[in-house]
Structure formats: C-alpha cells, structure tokens
A protein has these predicted regions:
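Basic nucleic-acid-binding interfaces
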Residues: 1-139
Length: 139
C-alpha cells in the first residue's frame, strides 16, 4: 500500500488526513496576550491540552486577542468537542496563572462563544470532484 503524505495511520486499520484551521477570539476581543511571556504561556497551555486529547498541533499562533491553530485529530473526535476542550481547559488554567485577567472581562469568560473551523487539504474541492467523477469510467 502506498503511504499518503501527511496521513496519520492508526493501529485499528484506518487512515485519516484531515486538518483544520481553528480560530477563536477573546471575549469582547480584549487584548489579553500582550507580552511574549503571555503568548508563550498560552501556547504551552494549548500544547498541553492537545497532548492530553490526541490532537496534533501543526502550527500555532497566539495573537493579542485571538488564536490560530492548524490541527489534526482522530475522526472519532468532533470539531465542537475539540474546540470545547481547548477553550474550556485553557481558560481555567489561564485564570489560575493570571487571575487578574478576570477583571478585564465582564462575566469572567476568557473566550467568546464563537469560533471558526475550516478544513485544509492538499487537494482542492475541484480536484476531488473530478477524481470522483472519473471513477465512473473505471468500472
């Protein structure tokens, strides 16, 4: 069997090659991660959470008021649960280290409720569509 570039092979016999670009913002887009130290602390927290949840972080960037992640995780995990794990645990751990942050945020929430999730692939939708359509002639 030819190996698929960037695919993750599981002992159970399935292969997945799905990558997600995740973005979420701080509550009210407040600039919370304003120093290199704070950005690094958040990167470390997110990396720890990923390791505990079988999530592979391929790229990470912490901006003043939002997070960018390029991640991959087993198909049995849902995007919603992955984001919930990141946001929930990171907020709890962040407030333990920086309790003064709560005063900057009404209601004491670090993150807004919303997030963006987009799939990222090495083939465009059009390439996949043409490949599938081409399978008809291979019968």
């Amino acid at each position: 069997m030819n190996k698929i570039k960037d695919a993750i092979y599981m002992p159970g016999g399935y292969v997945y090659n799905v990558h997600y670009h995740l973005i979420w913002v701080t509550k009210y887009r407040k600039p919370i991660f304003v120093t290199d130290e704070k950005r690094q602390v958040m990167k470390n927290l997110l990396t720890k959470i990923a390791n505990l949840n079988e999530i592979t972080i391929q790229e990470i960037e912490v901006m003043n008021d939002h997070i960018h992640l390029l991640v991959s995780f087993p198909p049995r995990l849902s995007i919603t649960n992955v984001v919930k794990a990141f946001k929930g645990a990171s907020a709890r751990l962040w407030f333990q280290q920086f309790p003064e942050t709560k005063q900057l945020l009404w209601g004491g929430h670090l993150w807004s409720r919303s997030y963006y999730a987009g799939t990222v692939g090495n083939m465009s939708q059009e390439v996949v569509r043409k490949y599938i359509q081409g399978q008809r002639s291979c019968k």
